[in-house]
Swiss-Prot record:
Homodimer. Interacts with RNase III. It comes from Pantoea vagans (strain C9-1). Its EC number is 3.1.1.106. InterPro entries: Macro_dom, Macro_dom-like, O-Ac-ADP-ribose_deAcase. GO terms for biological process: purine nucleoside metabolic process. Residues 1-171 form the Macro domain. Keywords: Hydrolase, Plasmid. PROSITE patterns: MACRO. This is O-acetyl-ADP-ribose deacetylase 2. It catalyses: 3''-O-acetyl-ADP-D-ribose + H2O = ADP-D-ribose + acetate + H(+); 2''-O-acetyl-ADP-D-ribose + H2O = ADP-D-ribose + acetate + H(+). SUPFAM superfamilies: Macro domain-like (SSF52949). The active site is at D34 (proton acceptor). It holds the Pfam family Macro.
Amino acid sequence: MNKITVIQGDITNIASEAIINVANSSLLGGGGVDGAIHRAGGPVILAECQAIRSRQGGCKVGEAVITGAGTLPADYVIHTVGPRWSDGRHNEDTQLKSVYLSCFKLVGHHGIKTVSFPNISTGIYGFPKKRAAAIALDVIKHCIAENRTIEKVNLVCFDAENYDLYLKLLN
């Protein structure tokens, strides 16, 4: 059974145990996916993010933290900070790999079986879409092989270009 599914749509409407939020380092909400998740999940997500911020000062690039999901169709939101693309010579690939590995570490720790990822860093952060998709799939396949309890990973693409890229790379 193929455990990776590619979906074109809004991640806030996808039912899974955990959804990944591409946050900023403050964890206080923002634009794009981050803003959509905070709006759809309600104030409980921001309150939990503020508590994390009080304890550890936010979240660094490549790291991840977990909160409840509020009114989203999920149990958890895993917040991570993706890298900004510079020129490919400033560890951007390694940082993006760390994003996925940090998310999967929390998935394993919490016994999560289904998780939904948006496209990470390919919007305003400028990461080349094909490069980001290849990195994502490489790490996801590795993590699925390492963690046999993962049943399903949804790759939720807001735009057709990322959706088509994932489909091509998976086939």
